[in-house]
């Protein structure tokens, strides 16, 4: 369940993992990181 480019992580772990891996969206600090791109 990858989120789309430009979307924010909605708090779902899979979405935020995808975000971290691809580095194209905003990820929340909930999971110990903050990434935007």
Swiss-Prot record:
Subcellular localization, as worded in the UniProt entry: Secreted
Q: Which UniProt keywords apply?
A: Calcium channel impairing toxin, Disulfide bond, Ion channel impairing toxin, Neurotoxin, Secreted, Toxin, Voltage-gated calcium channel impairing toxin
Specify the superkingdom.
Eukaryota
Q: Where in the body, by tissue, does this protein show up?
A: Expressed by the venom gland.
Q: State the post-translational modifications.
A: Disulfide bonds are present.
Q: Does the keyword Secreted apply?
A: yes
Q: Which GO terms describe its molecular function?
A: calcium channel regulator activity; toxin activity
Write down the Pfam families for this protein, in alphabetical order. Answer: Toxin_34 (PF08396)
> What is one term from the GO cellular component aspect held by the record?
extracellular region
Keyword Disulfide bond attributed: yes
* Miscellaneous comment in the UniProt entry for this protein: Negative results: this toxin does not inhibit Cav3 (T-type) channels.
Similarity section: Belongs to the neurotoxin 04 (omega-agtx) family. 03 (type II/III omega-agtx) subfamily.
Query: Briefly, what is this protein's role?
Result: Omega-agatoxins are antagonists of voltage-gated calcium channels. This toxin blocks calcium channels in insect central neurons but not at peripheral neuromuscular junctions. In vertebrates, it is broadly active against all high-threshold Cav1/CACNA1 channels and Cav2.2/CACNA1B channels.
The name of this protein is Omega-agatoxin-Aa3d
Tell me the organism.
Answer: Agelenopsis aperta (North American funnel-web spider)
């Amino acid at each position: 369940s990858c989120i789309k480019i430009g979307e924010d992580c909605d708090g779902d772990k899979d979405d935020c993992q995808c975000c971290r891996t691809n580095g194209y969206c905003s990820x929340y600090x909930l999971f110990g990181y903050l990434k935007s791109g």
